[in-house]
C-alpha cells in the first residue's frame, strides 16, 4: 500500500490484527472473503486486492487477512517462502522430530496459508511454546528477540487484553497463561512462570462446544495434572 490509510500500515499492526483491513471473519458463509481465502488458487492476489478501510493501529479485530499479509511481508523481506524460512530458522534449530506440513493455495501459486493449516505433532508444537516461554532462546541460541517476545505475550491494546502478537492471553488462578488457538479445538497452552506447556490436538469434544469453554477445561485439567505429578 503506497497511498491512503494503507501507507500507514506497520508489521506490528498486522501481528496484532489491527490493520483496518476490509475483512469479514466468517467461516461458514458461502459468499465471504474468509471462505474464498480457503478455496482460491491465487491467495496473493486476493489479499493484495483487499482495501484498508480504517486507520491502522487503533484496535484489535480478528482477521485472517492480517496474518496472511504478514506472511507475505516476511516472504518479501527474507526472499524465501514461509516453509523454508520456518524450517531454516525454527524447526531445524529447535530439533523438530518430524517434518511439518503447510497447506498451499495451489501448486502453481505456491503460497502458504499463513493464517492456518500448519500441521505437526504435539511434541513439536510444544517446542514453539517452549521458545516463547524461554524469551526466544533455544539451547542458548537466540532465535527470536526478547523484546519481540515480550510484545507478543502481552496485550497491545487496553480494550483487547486477551491478544498480543499472535498469542491469546488468559489468567488461571492468578497465573499468566498464553495460548496458540487452532481450528476446532487444537491448542498450545503455556504457563510461563510454572514452566508448564500443554498441547491438545484433535476435534471439539462434541457438536456445539465453545472453543473458549473447551480451552478453559484444558487449561484447568492440564495444569492440575501437571502439578500433581511433579
Positions of PLM-derived features:
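Active-site Gly/Thr loop motif
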Residues: 98, 103, 150-197
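Flexible glycine/proline-enriched surface loops and loop-helix/loop-strand junctions
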Residues: 29, 51-56, 66-68, 107-114, ...
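A short acidic/small-residue loop/turn micro-motif
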Residues: 204-206
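Residue-level detector of functionally pivotal "anchor" positions at catalytic/ligand-binding pockets or at interdomain
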Residues: 227-230
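Structural recognition of the beta-strand scaffold that forms the well-ordered cores
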Residues: 13-16, 61, 100-102, 117-119, ...
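Alpha-helical scaffold elements that line and support the substrate/ligand-binding pocket
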Residues: 14, 47, 60-90, 125-131, ...
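Active-site helix/loop module of the DD-peptidase/beta-lactamase fold
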Residues: 1-21, 49-51, 78-115, 120
Amino acid at each position: 500500500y503506497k497511498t491512503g490509510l494503507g501507507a500507514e500500515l506497520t508489521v506490528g499492526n498486522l501481528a496484532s490484527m489491527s490493520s483496518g483491513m476490509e475483512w469479514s471473519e466468517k467461516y461458514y458463509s458461502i459468499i465471504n472473503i474468509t471462505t474464498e481465502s480457503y478455496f482460491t488458487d491465487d491467495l496473493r492476489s486476493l489479499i493484495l486486492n483487499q482495501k484498508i478501510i480504517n486507520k491502522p493501529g487503533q484496535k484489535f479485530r480478528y482477521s485472517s487477512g492480517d496474518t496472511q499479509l504478514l506472511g507475505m511481508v516476511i516472504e518479501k523481506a527474507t526472499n524465501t517462502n514461509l516453509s523454508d524460512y520456518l524450517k531454516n530458522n525454527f524447526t531445524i534449530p529447535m530439533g523438530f522430530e518430524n517434518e511439518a506440513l503447510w497447506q498451499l493455495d495451489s501448486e502453481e501459486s505456491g503460497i502458504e496459508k499463513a493464517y492456518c493449516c500448519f500441521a505437526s505433532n504435539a511434541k513439536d508444537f510444544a517446542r514453539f511454546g517452549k521458545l516463547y516461554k524461554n524469551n526466544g532462546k533455544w539451547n542458548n541460541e537466540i532465535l527470536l528477540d526478547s523484546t519481540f517476545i515480550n510484545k507478543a505475550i502481552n496485550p497491545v491494546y487496553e480494550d483487547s487484553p486477551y491478544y498480543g502478537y499472535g498469542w491469546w492471553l488468559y489468567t488461571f488462578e492468578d497465573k499468566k497463561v498464553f495460548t496458540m488457538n487452532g481450528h476446532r479445538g487444537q491448542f498450545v497452552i503455556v504457563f510461563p512462570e510454572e514452566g508448564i506447556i500443554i498441547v491438545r490436538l484433535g476435534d471439539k469434544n462434541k457438536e456445539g462446544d465453545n472453543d473458549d469453554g473447551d480451552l478453559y477445561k484444558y487449561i484447568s485439567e492440564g495444569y492440575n495434572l501437571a502439578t500433581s505429578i511433579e
